[in-house]
Amino acid sequence: MQSVDLTHHFLIAMPAMTDPFFAKTLTYICEHSDQGALGLVVNRPIDLTLKDLLDQLDISSDDQLTRRFPIMFGGPIQLDRGFVLHQPVGEWQSTMAVNDDVGLTTSLDILRAIANGESPRQLLVALGYSGWAPGQIEHELSRNAWLTVPASPAIIFELPAEERLTAAMRLLGVDFSSLSDEVGHA
């Protein structure tokens, strides 16, 4: 049973996390309900740029930004599917509003807009997503697999991927290197 809504929160993988998909990750939760949770890993770039992705989709772009804009590994589910996390929410064919400021879009129209220089003000593009069955995320939290903190869009959209985990930890006032692999409940 869902006890807290983690939508628009970060999940910070604890040092003891051994799952190779999630070790040392920062995951942004886009949706959390009694039906489960959906999130995107926001600190693990893959060897693909936005220009590469647009080329694969036969969407032409001469925008220099797309040549150096990294694509993130969003999670191990549907690795062939693209997800665009963006500010503002805007109006796209297939958008889920995470909150009043952040949207998650899966339709090609947003990629075409990006290629034409008409993209949302802030964006992160990922392949794949992270998903949890009903009650799974709560179970993992009870086993101390994750720390949670309300998300900061500035961390997602304004910092390089390699700085995001540390910045999220600072929101909690915690240094990642000081965390123990051995944790328990009082």
Swiss-Prot record:
Disulfide bridge partners, by residue number: none
Regions crossing the membrane: none
Pfam families: DUF179
Domain of life, per lineage: Bacteria
InterPro entries, A to Z: AlgH-like
GO cellular component, one term: cytosol
Cited PANTHER family: UNCHARACTERIZED PROTEIN YQGE, UPF0301 PROTEIN YQGE
Family designation: Belongs to the UPF0301 (AlgH) family.
Protein name: UPF0301 protein Nmul_A2478
Organism from which the protein derives: Nitrosospira multiformis (strain ATCC 25196 / NCIMB 11849 / C 71)
Lineage of origin: Bacteria, Pseudomonadati, Pseudomonadota, Betaproteobacteria, Nitrosomonadales
